[in-house]
Design a protein with these regions (language model features):
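Extracytoplasmic
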Residues: 1-183
């Protein structure tokens, strides 16, 4: 392809903003003795924890340097055994996610939002392994290359009902990847 892959490291403070009223965020580092040490980019990840048992975990990722092109969007999740809360680690329940993407329209002046994974189509994340989830593809009508402020955002949130006990609300995220779509 004529354009390159974009990789957004989840643990970097400038790459994301969690919803403060529902979500607590932690940047975590893997121990060198962890079997996943060489499989996780930068040996670190973002842990998002709900503020309460009824909170829906939610975060926005800033995405810079998109070109006017089509990308496949992927999110790399880590296994639940890495969760700081040992009850979450022990239960090892899957995440169910919803994903939206917002970006500038063709005129470059207004933000459009697209549901990559809508609520009714929530995607299950495997809690037992590193799971690279392909959440869909998107075509950006304008380039944001070299813009100082990220106008492209990926919104990731828990897709479950309040108080649901069979789905994990704790997200362990390595990175977000936008790969050039293969034609």
């Amino acid at each position: 392809s004529w354009h390159s892959k974009l990789k957004i490291e989840a643990e970097y403070i400038n790459t994301h903003k969690s919803k403060e009223n529902t979500t607590v965020e932690y940047s975590r580092n893997l121990e060198v003795t962890d079997p996943l040490y060489y499989k996780v980019s930068n040996r670190s990840y973002l842990e998002l924890v709900p503020k309460s048992s009824s909170s829906a975990t939610e975060v926005d990722f800033n995405i810079w340097n998109t070109l006017a092109a089509t990308y496949d969007v992927k999110i790399v999740f880590l296994p639940q055994h890495l969760a700081t809360d040992k009850s979450v680690a022990k239960q090892c329940q899957p995440n169910y996610i919803r994903v939206d993407m917002s970006y500038l329209n063709e005129g470059g002046s207004k933000t459009e939002t697209v549901h990559l994974v809508a609520a009714k189509d929530s995607v299950m994340v495997d809690p037992t392994r590193i799971d690279t989830v392909n959440v869909g593809s998107i075509t950006f009508p304008v380039s944001t290359y070299a813009d100082e402020v990220a106008s492209t955002k990926l919104n990731l949130r828990f897709a479950g009902k309040s108080g649901e006990k069979t789905k994990s609300r704790t997200f362990l995220i390595d990175c977000v990847i936008l790969e050039p779509a293969k034609n």
